[in-house]
Each structure stands twice: as structure tokens, then as C-alpha cells.
Amino acid sequence: MGSARRLRKDTDYETGFWCAGGVGVLREEVWVDAREEVVRYNLAFLLPHLYYRDNGRVLGYDNAHGVHERHFMGNVEQVEFVEYSETADRFYREVGEIRRQYED
């Protein structure tokens, strides 16, 4: 495997917080190649006390299977991908909307 194919985990972030009467978890993982381009990512919002399936993942975006996907409450749909920052912005916006629904 040449250095151009070697991936480096650039971001590995996880935080827990109180949400909707239980502990929620936000997870962000990003892998980059030798040119610092994002080649793999996983964004997940977990509320296991509200949604027990899919390891508690209420919302997520990833490209784990070579396809860009959005996961929501067990449903999976393919999504258009332009660049990682746009996908991350969309994810965090949706997390905010979901949190507001449960906190109102």
C-alpha cells in the first residue's frame, strides 16, 4: 500500500450531553489521505434512551460503504455529496432541529 493510499484519522470527537431526558452522544470521525482530502467520515447523533435500534443512532451521515448516506431513525437514503464541510454543516443543523423538538 503506497503512502497515497494510507489514511490518517484526522478527527475523532465524541461528547455526551443531557438531551430529551437522557444522555445524548455526538460523534464525528474523519479520515484523510496523504493530500489531506477527506476520504471517509462518520457523523452520528445517538439518543439510545429514545431509539434503541441502530445502536441508538437517531441521525447519521457516513460513506462507510462507498456511498454517501443519511441515516434517520433506521431509514437510510443516499445523499448528494459535494464536500465534507457541507455534509457536516447539514448534520449539525439537523441535530439542532431534533434537539429543539425534544426540548420544547
What are these regions (language model features)?
Residues 1-69:
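The feature represents the first ordered module of a protein
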Residues 74-104:
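Short, compact, well-ordered microdomains
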